[in-house]
């Protein structure tokens, strides 16, 4: 019959168990079984600790045998790493990692080094006072420090040189890679630390702008020679440089400009929405006025279940939704949107009112037009001065009142004739009264 040891992670609530044969299991074997069962990995990045749930005492001895039917608490914490000079030189990072759970995965128990105790004289503490014991403690520490200094003086010093400075120095040696540019002078044949202008205190950099934050679709490549251009010319042409070392200029965003123009046109089209606002029409009848908006009724609807008053459709729907379907006029509840009935007769009255307003508005505009413009509108063909002998109806008679147009006689085209090469062109009479005042032949 197999034995069982119950365990539970400190951050969990459920309890698991490990099955084994025997009366007990060592701490080393228990940790290895827990790591394998929970698939915790190779153990290089954490350390596993086991505690007694009653006394919260850690089982730190791997050889300690835990009896069967025992419950333990398991805690996983980050590994403690300590790098030494020898581990860096050898390149063995795993050997430098201390305090992890690797040995439980590989099956190698922990090997403890024997500490070399220095020969110290232990004074007989029996029968001594507290001051004598303190003095003896300080004397022991001084002896240990002197022995440590003697060992350090005989040890061979090991010097470690950082590899980062060496690599960075080697990277900037030799010719620069393709695409590199010195941002001080604009040259591409040297590193910026080797720029010949570093020793010139009067040198002013070209101040080449970079394209940070600008999308590539708004950049256009150009070919220039930075050695032959002054900083003022580059700033005037707004030349920038990319990460690849290419010179570019910024182009306009046509798409955004077109979108702006389109939105502007839409706003102008939406200007017709002002006819539904309050105060747009000064002579608006009360029966065509919306009780909610105070303006002209727009898509008039009625509340069939209560007061049966006309409202604008959109305004009434918004008011019902915001007030939990309560009529804004008579405060009747449960007025649903499906109960709204369109008022066709009222909509026709609204259309008739708008047509009258358009006619009045159009007539007021026509009344402000000059007399010459009215004549051109009434006689767009320009046939008033084709022939002096031809009596054509004019748009304005001697009294100044307009007369209805009369059909032209048969054979006369409705447009002015072009002069023939063998006949001189006739003078165009702009004033219709001149035709009456001219002498008849």
Curated annotation (Swiss-Prot):
Q: Which residues form a coiled coil?
A: none
Pfam families per the UniProt record, alphabetical: DWNN
Q: Where is the composition biased (Basic and acidic residues)?
A: 355-364
| Domain of life (superkingdom) | Eukaryota
As stated in the Swiss-Prot or TrEMBL entry, residues carrying the post-translational modification Phosphoserine are 221
**Record keywords, A-Z:** Metal-binding, mRNA processing, Nucleus, Phosphoprotein, Zinc, Zinc-finger
Stretches of Polar residues bias are at: 384-400
Which biological process annotations from GO are given for this protein?
mRNA processing; protein polyubiquitination; protein ubiquitination; termination of RNA polymerase II transcription; termination of RNA polymerase II transcription, poly(A)-coupled; ubiquitin-dependent protein catabolic process
Specify whether Ubl conjugation is a keyword of the entry.
no
List, alphabetically, the InterPro entries matched: DWNN_domain (IPR014891), RBBP6 (IPR033489), Znf_CCHC (IPR001878), Znf_CCHC_sf (IPR036875), Znf_RING/FYVE/PHD (IPR013083)
Supply the Gene3D superfamilies for this chain: Phosphatidylinositol 3-kinase Catalytic Subunit, Chain A, domain 1, Zinc finger, CCHC-type, Zinc/RING finger domain, C3HC4 (zinc finger)
Task: Zinc fingers (CCHC-type): give the ranges.
Answer: 180-197
Chief place where the protein resides: nucleus
Name the source organism: Saccharomyces cerevisiae (strain ATCC 204508 / S288c)
Keyword Translocase on entry: no
Provide a Gene Ontology MF annotation, just one: ubiquitin protein ligase activity
What this protein is called in its record is Protein MPE1
Q: Report further notes.
A: Present with 1130 molecules/cell in log phase SD medium.
Every copy of the DWNN domain together lies at 5-78
UniProt-annotated location(s):
Nucleus
Q: Which GO terms describe its cellular component?
A: cytosol; mRNA cleavage and polyadenylation specificity factor complex; nucleus
The annotated region (Disordered) lies at: 355-400
Function of the protein: Component of the cleavage and polyadenylation factor (CPF) complex, which plays a key role in polyadenylation-dependent pre-mRNA 3'-end formation and cooperates with cleavage factors including the CFIA complex and NAB4/CFIB.
């Amino acid at each position: 019959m197999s034995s069982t040891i119950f365990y539970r992670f400190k951050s969990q609530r459920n309890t698991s168990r490990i099955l084994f044969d025997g009366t007990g299991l060592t701490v080393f074997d228990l940790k290895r079984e827990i790591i394998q069962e929970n698939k915790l990995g190779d153990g290089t990045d954490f350390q596993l600790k086991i505690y007694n749930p009653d006394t919260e005492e850690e089982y730190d001895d791997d050889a300690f045998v835990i009896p069967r039917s025992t419950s333990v608490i398991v805690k996983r914490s980050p590994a403690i790493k300590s790098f030494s000079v020898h581990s860096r030189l050898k390149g063995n990072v795993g050997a430098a990692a201390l305090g992890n759970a690797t040995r439980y995965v590989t099956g190698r128990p922990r090997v403890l080094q024997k500490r070399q105790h220095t020969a110290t004289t232990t004074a007989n503490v029996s029968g001594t006072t507290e001051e004598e014991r303190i003095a003896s403690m300080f004397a022991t520490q001084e002896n240990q420090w002197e022995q440590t200094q003697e060992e350090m003086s005989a040890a061979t010093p090991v010097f470690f040189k950082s590899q980062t400075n060496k690599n960075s120095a080697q990277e900037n040696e030799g010719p620069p890679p393709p695409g590199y540019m010195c941002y001080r002078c604009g040259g591409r044949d040297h590193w910026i630390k080797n720029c010949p202008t570093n020793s010139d205190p009067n040198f002013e950099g070209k101040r080449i702008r970079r394209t940070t934050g600008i999308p590539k679709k708004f950049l256009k490549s150009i070919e220039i020679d930075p050695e032959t251009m002054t900083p003022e010319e580059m700033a005037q042409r707004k030349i920038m440089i990319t990460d690849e070392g290419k010179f570019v200029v910024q182009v306009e965003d046509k798409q955004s400009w077109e979108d702006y123009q389109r939105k502007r046109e839409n706003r102008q089209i939406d200007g017709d929405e002002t006819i539904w606002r309050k105060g747009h029409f000064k002579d608006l009848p009360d029966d065509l006025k919306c009780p909610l908006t105070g303006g002209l009724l727009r898509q008039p609807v009625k509340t069939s279940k209560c007061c049966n008053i006309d409202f604008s459709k959109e305004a009434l729907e918004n008011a019902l939704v915001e007030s939990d379907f309560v009529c804004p006029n008579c405060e009747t509840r449960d007025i649903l949107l499906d109960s709204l009935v369109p008022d066709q007769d009222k909509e026709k009255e609204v259309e008739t009112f708008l047509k009258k307003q358009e006619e009045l508005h159009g007539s007021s505009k026509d009344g402000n037009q000059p007399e010459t413009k009215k004549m051109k509108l009434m006689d767009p063909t320009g046939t008033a001065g084709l022939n002096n002998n031809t009596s054509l109806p004019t748009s304005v008679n001697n009294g100044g009142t307009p007369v209805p147009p009369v059909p032209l006689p048969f054979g006369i085209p409705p447009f002015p004739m072009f002069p023939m090469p063998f006949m001189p062109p006739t003078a165009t009479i702009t004033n219709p009264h001149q035709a009456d005042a001219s002498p008849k032949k």
